[in-house]
UniProtKB/Swiss-Prot annotation:
GO terms for molecular function: extracellular matrix structural constituent; metal ion binding. The modification 3-hydroxyproline is found at P871, P1150, P1165, P1168, P1171. The modification 4-hydroxyproline is found at residues 176, 182, 194, 197, 212, 227, 242, 248, 275, 278, 284, 293, 299, 314, 320, 329, 332, 359, 362, 374, 380, 389, 395, 398, 413, 422, 437, 446, 461, 467, 476, 482, 494, 515, 521, 530, 533, 551, 569, 578, 590, 608, 626, 632, 644, 650, 656, 668, 689, 704, 710, 716, 725, 743, 758, 764, 785, 791, 794, 803, 809, 827, 836, 845, 857, 863, 872, 881, 884, 908, 914, 923, 932, 950, 962, 968, 983, 989, 995, 1004, 1010, 1031, 1034, 1037, 1106, 1109, 1130, 1145, 1151, 1166, 1169, 1172, 1175, 1178. This is Collagen alpha-1(I) chain. It comes from Cynops pyrrhogaster (Japanese fire-bellied newt). Trimers of one alpha 2(I) and two alpha 1(I) chains. The gene is COL1A1. Residues 1215-1450 form the Fibrillar collagen NC1 domain. Contains mostly 4-hydroxyproline. Proline residues at the third position of the tripeptide repeating unit (G-X-Y) are hydroxylated in some or all of the chains. The modification 5-hydroxylysine is found at K251, K416, K491, K737, K848, K1019, K1082, K1094. Ca(2+) binds at D1263, N1265, Q1266, C1268, D1271. Belongs to the fibrillar collagen family. InterPro entries: Collagen, Collagen_superfamily, Fib_collagen_C, VWF_dom.
Length: 1450
């Protein structure tokens, strides 16, 4: 009989060995039970409710209620655990049943043998298995050159798909290039197709024991046991307590006579009476001595059962009874009280190894039961003796990261790679050390002819000979002495470009270029054909354990087992004392080979191997694009003089050099013989005058000569006296505009303005040279965790978990009877691995297995041969503009522009949004070119661009090289089915079943031993750089797989550390000469060569520049006065002279205008009495001004002297002043309240509306720039709103066909004023206005307005203006061009879009229609509109016209 622990171990072993295989439904055996959608196997026990327990018996369900009355609970706080029926005491306080002792009842029959108990706790971890065989080949590697695949179909103008030509023969291998810096990380590639499954590896040896697990929760009750055999009779019990009084016994024997009584009085003798009644019993006498034992009486009838006596001491074990027949399974009994633990039995002998059973069919999936509450931990027991190694436990959580291991040894040198792509042109290297002097250069061309020597001193005058005849040309004279070198002439014009010189020697390798930006991800290529399996690689390190798989469905019920062992286990007893260690068992047979381990992760990169042998010569690469001009090198040493060169072609004549120094006086030549007379030469220039000859005799008087030519102009005569002033001339015509004045001096430097808004993105500059790599930045802060990755593939089924810790030792049980010999025991734990046995014979090949699941991807294959250069791919999408780089050095200051009108100084506002482009100023004169600025520091890297669109699907790649065939596996023939033996050792894990439903989350287990490495999951988003981990063990290289498609480019990786330099390889074959390098910097002048021989006479030089001015000649004699010149222009006004002395009084002027009537004067003196007459007027002052004045007697010539009492004159003066004041007052009033007339224009219509709110809308004159009113313009004022509306110069454009396209199907926007013949840009200002004046006034209007609007009406015939009714979109809508040259569209950014109030140009009807376009904006610089560009024009039947509305500012 097994103990309960053994029983649990058996169940645990069976659970670990179970292979989950998917079988068809028809394989499921009958005998199952179904209840509420759940299927139970035969003999399954379950509790549908806590107080109901059911059992499945060959398809029948039998249920019974659980009663709790037999075990009353005696504690104050009893509780019913979750899922249980009966109350229990929480921590053992109180008693769970009363301790009244009853009479011992009769012994019950032995119960039936119980079913197998629940699985026990998992054993400890086993030792780590041996490494598995190498995995199958990895996934295909990255693709090669995708350019040919991506180029098809992109060029819209190509005549068809360009088909690549046949591949040329592979050129000889070039020498290895320098290692480039690591390229950017590629984007994650799509998952490869699953590979074929790898061969199963050998089973590893048993692992080391894991640490003891936590005590498991109590298992559910086991199935009810079958009735046991009848036990032997128990020993006699102890004496019971006295029984209750029995019933009265039967009548006893007659007693002895009593003693005589005292003598009574003598009575009279009576007659003999009847016998009297018996007397009462006398008092009992004293007990007599004990008599002899009597004979044994007959057994009486059994009395009623007495109360239960105390338990007797155990008797000796009786002999075993015969085995009873197996009874039917009883209902589960109530849980019995826990018995004491019996002593450990001796170890049974080792049973034979059973044959491996066939895997059972999987049973239907059971419903997941509710998760029980975790029990409280028990008290820790005493330390037990070391147990035998348990079954390998489940992998624990990964341990803490170990310290980094030591650097692994350098790997063997890898095979030589193909030539790398040529790197980008490196930066110019540092100037080399001074070279050895080069060989002598070729002889230079002959120098310019020397200057003539000094003129010799004058010879003695010879006698004058008679003129001879002209002589023949003399032979060449003997060579003269060379003249001294003249100064070099000015530099000649540059010659034509010489032919390309021979290629220079190959330069040293430049530094690696910066890695390019990540390319667009290539399309997924077709899957290559799988390579044949490679040889087994070395075992990789164990991967991390995968997560526990979901529980598989229960298997089908097995064949009916033998009778079960003990019945239900009782509740958990208190922990017993630790038992003694058992003897060491016999070593078991070696276990079967374990499944292969998972491939390890790739090891850390080894150091670079030694340099490979030199490759063959590579084909000449295409010429690289010329690099940027390098900085000038340091000057080299002077070369040696060159060898004399061949005679060069005569150069262009140089300009005459400056005069050389005067030569030394030459030796006088020998006198030559007289030559024959030459032909008459041209008249020589007059010789210098000879010395005076002897005075001749006086000749005869000559005839008078003719009139000589006028002499040279004489010196100016002395200044004449001022003439009389001339009459006043007519007003001259307006002069032409003077030339621009010289630029004024630079003004004082202004205050630094606020930082302007960022300008618009410039056009992309040429790619700058790669800067040097910056120093590695500090490790960044840990990034936030990445997004949750895709769930990983289900891990392999975990191995069984470790067994729980030993429970407390139970109380000692009663000794049982010695049982019969038990069945063969479960196989013992595996002993230590034995020495390997001799190799068995190769078995016959087994039947072909089913196709395995796809294996993990193979390793990257060898790179294929480099393909031919494909046609260029299409341009990628433009990246987002980078941030503006820092400004260059300040250029030289331009010339000063024209002075603008002074603005009012405002408070400095905050920096506004970027202003509109200003009107194009007249260009300033070009300033001198500034020195090139030093390059600015590299700008901050822009944000990462969005991931590009995937490229086109690439062509199918070439198949990878087939790997060498693997060795055939050894597989024996399948043996005959043996009888069902005891469970064998743990088999290899089966194929993964389908994932079950996820279970409820369990309580966390204790920390396990570090698990094996898991297979790598799919790549997550790039995290921040973590701390560097320890290097993994290097994996064996896998067989090369086919080349896979290129992954997406990942984020650019950080620059890796430089590997150790390998030893230098042998020199490669000399390459073909490369393309000519960029022209080098000009070398320094060489040392002066030796003086060359005199060259041939050069050609006549070109006319030299005028020489420097000679020294002033002597003052000539004054010439005669010339005729008077024409009258000069009037001179500028002189400065004001000093005040002159007061002049004489002028003549009396003419009389002034008549004064106004004076006020009434004071009363005159009384007149003399008049003659009597009619009554006169009332007395009062008369105005004598109307009376004729007698002539004054004091007239004095023309002058007239006023007297203070001459009232008329005073009045005239007052009237004049008054008129002037009134005029000034009116002018001031006009300034304050302008009238909008041409003479008195307002500034804007808004001003007019504010001053004259009752005026009506109409045309008025305005002068926004104020100042002189000659440039005022006529506008329309809307007096309701205050808008100022400026009319166009030409308000309508005639309706006709304005444009016919050469290619009508190619629709594009065509600007009316810029492209169409006879078109023009729109101007504004109404009739008679100067467009230049209007533009200035519009500039001021825009400054004073906050809003502008304008309408344009587009008349159409068969031309779409806005909405295209056929397509329902705005693709054919017209474009408008604003004053600041910005384009205003129908759709897009709402700030640059116009609307329409009427749209009658939506389709081609052959009739005229119109669309009214309206644009309103707060960016006043965009209006007025100056051009329009329709798209739907170009055919002869498409016509349009335009009405241009006024532009209105508010």
């Amino acid at each position: 009989m097994f103990s309960f622990v053994d029983n649990r171990l058996l169940v645990l072993l069976a659970a670990c060995v179970l292979l989950v295989r998917a079988l068809d439904q028809e394989d499921i055996e009958s005998g199952l039970c179904h209840q509420e959608g759940t299927t139970y196997s035969d003999k399954d026990v379950w509790k549908p409710e806590p107080c109901v327990i059911c059992v499945c018996d060959n398809g029948n369900i039998m249920c019974d209620d659980v009663t709790c009355g037999d075990y009353p609970v005696d504690c104050p706080n009893a509780e019913i655990p979750f899922g249980e029926c009966c109350p229990v005491c929480p921590d053992g306080d109180g008693t769970s049943y009363s301790e009244q002792t009853g009479v011992e009842g009769p012994k019950g029959e032995v119960g039936p043998k119980g079913d197998r108990g629940l699985p026990g706790p998992p054993g400890r971890d086993g030792n780590p298995g041996l490494p598995g065989p190498p995995g199958p080949p990895g996934p295909p590697g990255l693709g090669g050159n995708f350019a040919p695949q991506m180029s098809y179909g992109y060029d819209e103008k190509s005549a068809g798909i360009s088909v690549p030509g046949p591949m040329g023969p592979m050129g000889p291998r070039g020498p290895p290039g320098p290692s480039g810096s690591p390229g950017p990380q590629g984007f994650q590639g799509p998952s490869g197709e699953p590979g074929e499954p790898g061969a199963a590896g050998a089973l590893g040896p048993r692992g080391l024991p894991g640490p003891p697990g936590k005590n498991g929760d109590d298992g559910e009750s086991g199935k009810p046991g079958r009735p046991g055999e009848r036990g032997p009779s128990g020993p006699q019990g102890a004496r019971g307590l006295p029984g209750t009084a029995g019933l009265p016994g039967m009548k006893g024997h007659r007693g002895f006579n009593g003693l005589d009584g005292a003598k009574g009085d003598n009575g009279p003798a009576g007659p003999k009476g009847e016998p009297g009644n018996p007397g009462e019993n006398g008092a009992p006498g004293q007990a007599g001595p004990r008599g002899l034992p009597g004979e044994r009486g007959r057994p009486g009838a059994p009395g009623p059962a007495g109360a239960r006596g105390n338990d007797g001491s155990p008797g000796a074990a009786g002999p075993p009874g015969p085995t009873g027949p197996t009874g039917p399974p009883g209902f589960p009994g109530a849980v019995g009280a826990k018995g004491d633990a019996g002593p450990q039995g001796s170890r049974g002998s080792e049973g034979p190894q059973g044959a491996r059973g066939e895997p059972g069919a999987p049973g239907p999936a059971g419903a997941a039961g509710p998760s029980g509450n975790p029990g409280t931990d028990g008290q820790p027991g005493g330390k037990g003796a070391t147990g035998s190694p348990g079954i390998a436990g489940a992998p624990g959580f990964p341990g803490a990261r170990g310290a980094p291991g030591p650097q692994g040894p350098a790997g063997a040198p890898g095979p030589k790679g193909n030539n790398g792509e040529p790197g980008a042109q490196g930066n110019k290297g540092e100037p080399g050390a001074k070279g050895e002097p080069g060989p002598a250069g070729v002889q230079g061309p002959p120098g310019p002819s020397g200057e003539e020597g000094k003129r010799g001193s004058r010879g003695e005058p010879g006698p004058a000979g008679p003129p001879g005849p002209a002589g023949e040309r003399g032979g060449p004279g003997s060579r003269g002495f060379p003249g001294s070198d003249g100064a070099s002439g000015p530099k000649g014009a540059p010659g034509e470009r010489g032919s390309v010189g021979p290629a220079g020697p190959k330069g040293s390798t430049g530094e690696s270029g910066r890695p390019g930006e990540p390319g667009l991800p290539g399309a997924k290529g077709l899957t290559g054909s799988p390579g044949s399996p490679g040889p087994d690689g070395k075992t990789g390190p164990a991967g991390a354990a995968g997560q526990d798989g979901h529980p598989g469905p229960p298997g089908p019920s097995g064949a009916r087992g033998q009778s079960g062992v003990m019945g239900f286990p009782g509740p958990k007893g208190a922990a017993g004392e630790p038992g003694k260690s058992g003897e060491r068992g016999v070593a078991g047979p070696p276990g079967a080979t374990g499944a292969p381990g998972k491939d390890g992760e790739a090891g850390a990169q080894g150091p670079p191997g030694p340099s490979g042998p030199s490759g063959e010569r590579g084909e000449q690469g295409p010429a690289g694009s010329p690099g940027f001009q390098g900085l000038p090198g340091s000057p080299g040493p002077a070369g040696e003089a060159g060898k004399p060169g061949e005679q060069g072609a005569p150069g262009d004549a140089g300009g005459p050099g400056p005069s050389g120094p005067r030569g030394e006086r030459g030796f006088p030549g020998e006198r030559g013989g007289q030559g024959p007379a030459g032909a008459q030469g041209p008249r020589g220039s007059p010789g210098s005058p000879g010395n005076d000859g002897a005075k001749g005799e006086a000749g005869a008087a000559g005839a008078p000569g003719g009139r000589g030519p006028p002499g040279l102009q004489g010196m100016p005569g002395e200044r004449g006296s001022a003439g009389m002033p001339g009459a006043k001339g007519d007003r001259g015509d307006a002069g032409t505009k003077g030339a621009d004045g010289a630029p004024g001096k630079d003004g004082a430097r202004g205050l630094t303005g606020p930082i302007g808004p960022p300008g618009p993105s410039g056009a992309p500059g040429d790619k700058g040279e790669g800067g040097p790599s910056g120093p590695a930045g500090p490790t960044g802060a840990r990034g936030s965790p990445g997004e949750r990755g895709e769930p990983g593939a289900p891990g392999p089924a975990g191995i069984c978990g470790p067994p729980g810790a030993d429970g407390q030792p139970g109380a000692k049980g009663e000794s049982g009877d010695a049982g019969p010999k038990g069945d063969a025991g479960a196989p013992g734990p595996a002993g230590p691995t034995g020495a390997p046995g001799p190799a068995g014979n190769v078995g016959a090949p087994g039947p072909k297995g089913t196709r395995g699941a796809a294996g993990p991807p193979g390793a990257t294959g060898f790179p294929g041969a480099a393909g031919r250069l494909g046609p260029p791919g299409p341009s990628g999408n433009a990246g987002p503009p980078g941030p503006p780089g820092p400004g260059g050095k300040e250029g030289a200051k331009g010339s000063r522009g024209e002075t603008g009108p002074a603005g009012r100084s405002g408070e400095p506002g905050p920096a506004g949004p970027p202003g509109p482009s200003g009107e194009k100023g007249s260009p300033g004169s070009d300033g001198p070119a500034g020195a090139p600025g030093i390059p600015g520091p590299q700008g901050i890297a822009g944000q990462r661009g969005v991931v590009g669109l995937p490229g086109q699907r690439g062509e199918r790649g070439f198949s990878g090289l087939p790997g060498p065939a693997g060795e055939p596996g050894k597989q024996g023939p399948s043996g005959p089915n043996g009888e069902r033996g005891p469970p064998g050792p743990s088999g290899p894990p089966g194929l993964g079943g389908p994932p079950g439903e996820p279970g409820r989350e369990g309580s966390p287990g204790s920390e396990g031993a570090p698990g094996r490495d898991g297979s790598p999951g799919p790549k997550g988003d790039r995290g921040e750089n973590g701390p560097s981990g320890p290097p993994g063990a290097p994996g064996a290289p896998g067989a090369p797989g086919p080349v896979g498609p290129a992954g997406k480019n990942g984020d650019r990786g950080e620059t890796g550390p430089a590997g150790p330099a390998g030893p230098a390889g042998p020199s490669g074959v000399r390459g073909a000469p490369g393309p000519a390098g960029a022209r080098g910097d000009k070398g320094e002048a060489g040392e002066q060569g030796e003086r060359g021989m005199k060259g041939h006479r050069g050609f006549n030089g070109m006319q030299g520049p005028p020489g420097p001015p000679g020294s002033s000649g002597e003052q000539g004699a004054p010439g005669p006065s010339g005729p008077a010149g024409p009258r000069g222009p009037p001179g500028s006004s002189g400065s004001t002279g000093k005040d002159g002395v007061n002049g004489l009084p002028g003549p009396i002027g003419p009389p002034g205008p008549r004064g106004r009537n004076g006020d009434v004067g004071p009363a005159g003196p009384p007149g003399p009495p008049g003659p009597p007459g009619p009554p006169g007027p009332p007395s009062g002052g008369f105005d004598f001004s109307f009376m004729p004045q007698p002539p004054e007697p004091k007239s004095h010539g023309d002058g007239r002297y006023f007297r203070a009492d001459d009232a008329n004159v005073v009045r005239d003066r007052d009237l004049e002043v008054d008129t002037t004041l009134k005029s000034l007052s009116a002018q001031i009033e006009n300034i304050r309240s302008p009238e909008g007339t041409r003479k008195n224009p307002a500034r804007t219509c808004r001003d007019l509306k504010m001053c004259h709110s009752d005026w009506k809308s109409g045309d008025y004159w305005i002068d926004p720039n104020q100042g002189c009113n000659l440039d005022a313009i006529k506008v329309h004022c809307n007096m309701e709103t205050g808008e100022t509306c400026v009319y166009p110069s030409q308000a309508s454009i005639s309706q006709k066909n304005w444009y016919t396209s050469k290619n009508p199907r190619e629709k594009k926007h065509v600007w009316f004023g810029e492209t169409m013949s006879d078109g023009f840009q729109f101007e504004y200002g109404g009739e008679g206005s100067d467009p230049a004046d209007v533009n200035i006034q519009l500039t001021f209007l825009r400054l004073m307005a906050t809003e502008a609007s304008q309408n344009i009406t587009y008349h159409c015939k068969n031309s779409v203006a806005y909405m295209d009714q056929e397509t329902g979109n705005l693709k054919k809508a017209v474009l408008l061009q604003g004053s600041n040259e910005i384009e205003i569209r129908a759709e897009g950014n709402s700030r640059f879009t116009y609307g329409v109030t009427e749209d009658g140009c939506t389709q081609h009807t052959g009739e005229w229609g119109k669309t009214v376009i309206e644009y309103k904006t707060t960016k006043t610089s965009r209006l007025p509109i100056i051009d329009i560009a329709p798209m739907d024009v170009g055919t002869p039947d498409q016509e349009f016209g335009i009405d241009i509305g006024p532009v209105c500012f508010l």
